[in-house]
Amino acid sequence: MHRTTRIKITELNPHLMCVLCGGYFIDATTIIECLHSFCKTCIVRYLETSKYCPICDVQVHKTRPLLNIRSDKTLQDIVYKLVPGLFKNEMKRRRDFYAAHPSADAANGSNEDRGEVADEDKRIITDDEIISLSIEFFDQNRLDRKVNKDKEKPKEEVNDKRYLRCPAAMTVMHLRKFLRSKMDIPNTFQIDVMYEEEPLKDYYTLMDIAYIYTWRRNGPLPLKYRVRPTCKRMKISHQRDGLTNAGELESDSGSDKANSPAGGIPSTSSCLPSPSTPVQSPHPQFPHISSTMNGTSSSPSGNHQSSFANRPRKSSVNGSSATSSG
């Protein structure tokens, strides 16, 4: 499979930033007439003096433009997950604001409005965050025995697990290299890191896995690994080479049969050429060894010296061609 294209956050900035303040969306709000989004405070302040969209100049509403704007929670979650540290910094600003202005009306707001929501509650993971994970050997037979397992088997399963604390930006490829070096697995075997029964791609980070499989932080991120041999392709290539060598040996034996005393007898084998088809020499670097005579192929045999001795030689005397025999 082809690797998934990964783009930079700067390429997505036009879709994540407010044109009114130039920053990333905070409390993203969308105009329902044209679907352009802005920060909530930015668009509310703008619509106090205008009734048109700041981007496309479409009329939001004739008299009450605030009726045609909606909070976009999905877009805001995307911004928080794509921009590292944005959610944590925003929550800190809100806590500092209400601490400096205790008279501000925050009782009617939600915990997020007051800045009292942690990253864990929002399920937002940053690149520098440390993720706890557990990894164990994937055994298909163990899964089949789950129905009839006895009291000692759960202890074995617990002992097989290993617990790690890794940064969220760590990739599956790094985890595979760690397992190979830690367990001395030779290079002739391939390691697959899995979530449940699905192999994970090498470029997945732990943060990607947590988002894709909706990790709830109610325990370590459960991962598994399996080891399998990687020499299958080499076996296929060896078989192909063996077939090729066998074909060459068979063609050589066919040419030898043509020069043998029984070579003049017609053969029913499909490996031999037809009388009208010239046979190429099995030694391309010496094309003069094989020649086509009367539709049959002759190749060097045990008496090839006598054939060269009886072969006529051409010589040129005063521009005329004369043929002499040895």
From Swiss-Prot:
InterPro entries (alphabetical):
RAWUL, Znf_RING, Znf_RING/FYVE/PHD, Znf_RING_CS
Question: Where found, per UniProt?
Answer: Nucleus; Cytoplasm
Name of the protein: Polycomb complex protein BMI-1
What is the annotated tissue distribution of the protein whose record heads this document? Answer: Transcripts are found in thymic lymphomas bearing insertions of the gene. Transcription is low or undetectable in mid-gestational fetal liver, neonatal and adult spleen, and in healthy lymph nodes.
Q: What does the record note about the induction of this protein?
A: Down-regulated by oxidative stress.
Q: Which GO terms describe its biological process?
A: chromatin remodeling; negative regulation of gene expression, epigenetic; negative regulation of transcription by RNA polymerase II; positive regulation of ubiquitin-protein transferase activity
Motif span (Nuclear localization signal)? 81-95
- State the residue spans of region: Interaction with E4F1: 164-228
- Does the keyword Nucleus belong to this entry? yes
- One Gene Ontology cellular component: PcG protein complex
Q: Which UniProt keywords apply?
A: Chromatin regulator, Cytoplasm, Metal-binding, Nucleus, Proto-oncogene, Repressor, Transcription, Transcription regulation, Ubl conjugation, Zinc, Zinc-finger
* Domain of life the protein comes from: Eukaryota
| GO MF annotations, alphabetized | promoter-specific chromatin binding; zinc ion binding
Q: What post-translational changes are documented for it?
A: May be polyubiquitinated; which does not lead to proteasomal degradation. Monoubiquitinated.
Q: Which SMART domains did the record assign?
A: RING (SM00184)
What is known about what this protein does?
Component of a Polycomb group (PcG) multiprotein PRC1-like complex, a complex class required to maintain the transcriptionally repressive state of many genes, including Hox genes, throughout development. PcG PRC1 complex acts via chromatin remodeling and modification of histones; it mediates monoubiquitination of histone H2A 'Lys-119', rendering chromatin heritably changed in its expressibility. The complex composed of RNF2, UB2D3 and BMI1 binds nucleosomes, and has activity only with nucleosomal histone H2A.
Q: Where is this region: Disordered?
A: 236-326
For region Interaction with PHC2, the annotated ranges are 162-182
| Species of the source | Felis catus
Low complexity bias: start-end ranges: 266-278, 290-303, 315-326
Give positions of the RING-type zinc fingers. Answer: 18-57
- Which Pfam family, any one, appears in the UniProt record? zf-C3HC4_2
